[in-house]
Amino acid sequence: MDENEQSARDVEQRGASDESNSAIRPLLQAPGNLQLPHRITNFFIDNILRPDFGRKKEANITRYEDNHGARENHNPTGPSTGQVGSTVPAEEASTTHTSSGGKEAEIESEEPLKPRGENVDQCLGSESDSSQSNSNGQTGQGMLWPAWVYCTRYSDRPSSGPRSRKPKKKAASKEDKRPRTAFTAEQLQRLKAEFQTNRYLTEQRRQSLAQELGLNESQIKIWFQNKRAKIKKASGVKNGLAIHLMAQGLYNHSTTSKEDKSDSD
């Protein structure tokens, strides 16, 4: 007896669940509550890198919409055709034409939602990638790009446009360099006399000499530096500190001329 009662309860519960499912199905299949078919996908790296990634889902959606539209077109019991059909045949033809036109307008209003992913950045997912791949196939390119191409910053797709590159800096020409100062004979004589007196000028002495000769302080400073370098290179005499460091192996910058080296050899 207990087993029979348990089986009867199971049958009643199944019947109640079937009734609830049958009551919910018309709501889900209503035109206002259009439910898209859901497909479980395995998001492995191999699947994502394939060119046909995301195309199957959109194909199922278009098939569902086509089947749904065909059912509506072949539905004989329409509220508008049933009411007008009892009056005049001409009006029936006009009403069927207007109703079909309204359905076409609804379909056209739904169609612009598909190519929206073509103009937006394609890093949103498989749906945007599938729409882009379909558009490429329609244009006749015959090239399928995988999903990861649209998530890279520098992609070779045509929609990315020309790449912006930083302009290269022009190499400094010789004309941009500061020209050498052409000293007059009087200025050279005065500079040589000052150099013989003291090879190193103080700041005050350099300022006064610049005012007397009509030169810049930097010009006088550079002339003195060059003059000291020439004498040092010609004489080959090393500084005492340099000799001390060379003895310890801490200084090996040779400042002697090639002639001195050849003579020593």
From Swiss-Prot:
Any one GO CC term of the record: nucleus
An annotated GO BP: regulation of transcription by RNA polymerase II
Keyword presence, DNA-binding: yes
Disulfide bond positions: none
InterPro entries: Engrailed_Homeobox_TFs (IPR050720), HD (IPR001356), HD_engrailed (IPR000747), HD_metazoa (IPR020479), Homeobox-engrailed_C-terminal (IPR019549), Homeobox-engrailed_CS (IPR019737), Homeobox_CS (IPR017970), Homeodomain-like_sf (IPR009057)
Family assignment from sequence similarity: Belongs to the engrailed homeobox family.
Composition bias, Basic and acidic residues: 1-17, 65-74, 103-119
GO molecular function: DNA-binding transcription factor activity, RNA polymerase II-specific; RNA polymerase II cis-regulatory region sequence-specific DNA binding
Keyword DNA-binding: yes
Protein name per UniProt: Homeobox protein engrailed-2a
Biased composition (Low complexity): 125-142
Organism classification: Eukaryota, Metazoa, Chordata, Craniata, Vertebrata
Native source organism of the sequence: Danio rerio
